[in-house]
């Protein structure tokens, strides 16, 4: 049966670190488990903060960035499957900032967030 032939893969995935397991199950198996989404975003946010420790980020900007971390995960998943990500104008609207402010302040953070998820994908696989 198919369950038997795939059991070694399931065991391998389930033995991974929590954020790797959560990413693979959410991204590739289509699981919408809330706990996986939380594990992915918490891990990515911690990674983002670790990378950003050398630069001071204003509190209001920080709050807006928190709201974007899950969108970055969704954008990377879409890209991995040949879909399109978000346009910067859309992201500016979602973040509640002007496109000029997005370009000046948020673009580099958005790129860093997406890079974190691309790295997570590579490491998990």
Place the predicted regions along the sequence by residue.
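N-terminal interaction/assembly modules
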Residues: 1-52, 56-61, 80-125
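Short helix-coil-helix linker/hinge
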Residues: 14-21, 66-74
